[in-house]
């Protein structure tokens, strides 16, 4: 490893989609960071966007900081010390996520990336995630005038904690699995209606859905739809299974639960939540996790009644002045 300070290391700035080699480098570093920290440094949405490339709703800005070998030309250095990715929305706002390889921490790598980002893009409309609420991320955010604006709780239910209540579906509502090639448009409409208050989820496009369906983890059997006698989708529970790694067992996730406005107030949300958890438990998974905003008191209360406890938190940072 070079003793040179990171301020002298080359930073590759890529606007638009990344090539396969850079994506492999990002994926390998992210895996090393997750193994060290216990949390993935990138959200699933960011990885989906990186793999799928830019779309009509998202554009990309990526920065990669390479640590030059003492014997090599810095322009061709191979050691990726850290990277940053900004997913830009059509309205000009963006979300930053950043990762530093465990071998290169406490050397100013993150600061170099953020300084380069400030010079190349600026901070207008920019927010940032820290997955796992790391102290180093909080210090870096404060240095650049950012403060916490949102806290996303990761809650967990283990098999030993699980005493799920009976939660029958409402009358004239049945449950079935998502059928690829048939249900995409109907589900997108139901999702948009269910999350009209949550544009991050509600604005999902056919391309976004296709990208998720192309992921290795996608299994239509765990994508549960609640339908009325006419077949109309009233709600859904999309589950996910994270494969085991590094000696850790596979774990299930309450990926997203939604209920359309006309079906709310019937207990369908609770019934769908319980049905999805039972589906995951029947697959032999030792634990189930979910994400919810810390200030969503009704959701937190429901999940606690089901046996979930707070496990970790992700923190979003924004400018202190609200800019």
Swiss-Prot record:
Stated role: Catalyzes the transfer of acetyl from acetyl-CoA to desacetylmycothiol (Cys-GlcN-Ins) to form mycothiol.
CDD domains: NAT_SF (cd04301)
Entry keyword set: Acyltransferase, Repeat, Transferase
GO molecular function, a single term: mycothiol synthase activity
Stretches assigned to coiled coil: none
Subunit comment: Monomer.
Family label: Belongs to the acetyltransferase family. MshD subfamily.
The protein, known as: Mycothiol acetyltransferase
Annotated 1D-myo-inositol 2-(L-cysteinylamino)-2-deoxy-alpha-D-glucopyranoside binding sites: 44, 200, 240, 253, 291
Presence of keyword Repeat: yes
Catalytic activity field: 1D-myo-inositol 2-(L-cysteinylamino)-2-deoxy-alpha-D-glucopyranoside + acetyl-CoA = mycothiol + CoA + H(+)
Record carries keyword Repeat: yes
Catalytic class of the enzyme: transferase
InterPro entries from the UniProt entry: Acyl_CoA_acyltransferase (IPR016181), GNAT_dom (IPR000182), MshD_Acetyltransferase (IPR050276), Mycothiol_AcTrfase (IPR017813)
Pfam families: Acetyltransf_1, Acetyltransf_7
Domain N-acetyltransferase: 173-323
Residues annotated for acetyl-CoA 1 binding in this entry: 98-100
């Amino acid at each position: 490893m070079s003793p040179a300070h990171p301020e002298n290391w080359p930073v590759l700035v890529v606007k638009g989609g990344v090539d396969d080699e850079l994506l492999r480098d990002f994926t390998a570093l992210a895996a090393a960071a997750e193994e060290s920290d216990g949390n993935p440094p990138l959200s699933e949405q960011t990885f989906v966007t990186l793999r799928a490339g830019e779309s009509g709703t998202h554009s990309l800005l990526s920065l990669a900081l390479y640590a030059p070998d003492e014997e090599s030309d810095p322009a061709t250095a191979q050691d990726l010390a850290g990277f940053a990715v900004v997913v830009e929305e059509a309205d000009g706002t963006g979300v930053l996520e950043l990762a530093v390889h465990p071998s290169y921490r406490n050397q100013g790598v993150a600061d170099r990336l953020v300084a380069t980002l400030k010079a190349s893009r600026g901070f207008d409309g920019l927010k940032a995630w820290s997955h796992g609420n790391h102290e180093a991320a909080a210090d870096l955010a404060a240095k650049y005038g950012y403060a916490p604006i949102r806290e996303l709780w990761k809650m967990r239910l283990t098999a030993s904690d699980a005493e799920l209540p009976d939660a029958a579906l409402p009358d004239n509502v049945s449950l079935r699995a998502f059928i690829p090639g048939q249900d995409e448009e109907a589900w997108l409409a139901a999702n948009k209606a269910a999350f009209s208050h949550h544009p991050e989820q509600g604005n999902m496009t056919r391309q976004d859905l296709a990208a998720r369906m192309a992921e290795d983890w996608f299994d239509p059997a765990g994508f549960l739809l609640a339908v009325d006698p006419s077949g109309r989708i009233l709600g859904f529970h999309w589950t996910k299974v994270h494969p085991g790694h590094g000696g850790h067992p596979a774990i299930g996730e309450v990926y997203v639960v939604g209920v359309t406005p006309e079906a709310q107030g019937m207990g369908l949300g609770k019934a769908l939540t319980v049905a999805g958890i039972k589906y995951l438990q029947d697959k032999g998974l030792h634990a189930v996790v979910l994400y919810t905003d810390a200030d969503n008191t009704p959701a937190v209360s429901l999940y606690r009644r089901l046996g979930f406890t707070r496990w970790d938190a992700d923190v979003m940072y924004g400018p202190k002045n609200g800019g």
